[in-house]
């Protein structure tokens, strides 16, 4: 085989291997997982994601005065249906988009608990974008840089391995078949 042909084959083999190398070194394959983070709880205490290691976790930035606030009801339905199988949901109230979460913890609890019957854990109000974002959201922005929250009710599904398994933008309702399919896939996954 000629030197030119050998160099060409080496170049082609390298080009074919590059995508798999890129996947192996992609941000989603970082050593840090979601289980490294915790949120202050809206009603006190901490919500430690490490306590749910090995289970899927849906982390959703929420707001009480948003056109999407009725998604609380869908999140509660999802929680009711799959919590006993291991699904964890964490709502993270945020005032980052349209100043639609200006209230106090009592105001937030009234909206979530009284108006929508929410029983899944809610974090204390936190920033989800920018340099003051909660560490979980900074990590998620590295894991999935083009799928960061652009509005309220952005959903990150954390897989059993602690990495982001799926991302659902605001417009996708919690009971949408795509969300349910992704949740069930993670629940059925054997580690």
Language-model regions: role of each:
Residues 25-50:
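N-terminal "domain-start" segment that seeds a small globular fold
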Residues 51-67, 89-90:
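Short active-site neighborhood of thiol/selenol oxidoreductases, capturing the structured segment around
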Residues 61-74, 100:
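Conserved redox-active cysteine motifs that mediate thiol-disulfide chemistry
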Residues 87-103, 120-130:
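Thiol-based oxidoreductase modules, predominantly thioredoxin-like and allied folds used
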Residues 1-15:
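N-terminal secretory signal peptides and thylakoid transit peptides that target proteins
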């Amino acid at each position: 085989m000629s030197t030119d042909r050998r160099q060409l084959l080496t170049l082609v083999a390298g080009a074919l291997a590059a995508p798999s190398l890129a996947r192996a070194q992609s941000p989603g394959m970082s050593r840090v997982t979601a289980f490294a983070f915790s949120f202050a709880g809206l009603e006190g205490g901490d919500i430690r994601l490490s306590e749910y290691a090995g289970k899927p976790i849906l982390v959703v930035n929420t707001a009480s005065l948003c056109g999407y606030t009725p998604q609380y009801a869908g999140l509660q339905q999802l929680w009711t249906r799959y919590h006993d199988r291991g699904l964890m949901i964490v709502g993270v109230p945020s005032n980052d988009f349209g100043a639609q979460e200006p209230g106090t913890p009592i105001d937030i609890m009234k909206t979530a608990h009284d108006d929508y019957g929410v029983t899944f854990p809610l974090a204390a109000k936190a920033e989800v974008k920018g340099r003051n974002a909660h560490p979980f959201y900074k990590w998620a922005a590295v894991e999935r840089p083009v799928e960061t929250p652009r509005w309220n009710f952005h959903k990150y599904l954390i897989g059993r391995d602690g990495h982001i398994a799926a991302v659902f933008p605001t417009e996708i309702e919690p009971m949408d078949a795509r969300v349910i399919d992704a949740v069930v896939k993670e629940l059925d996954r054997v580690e």
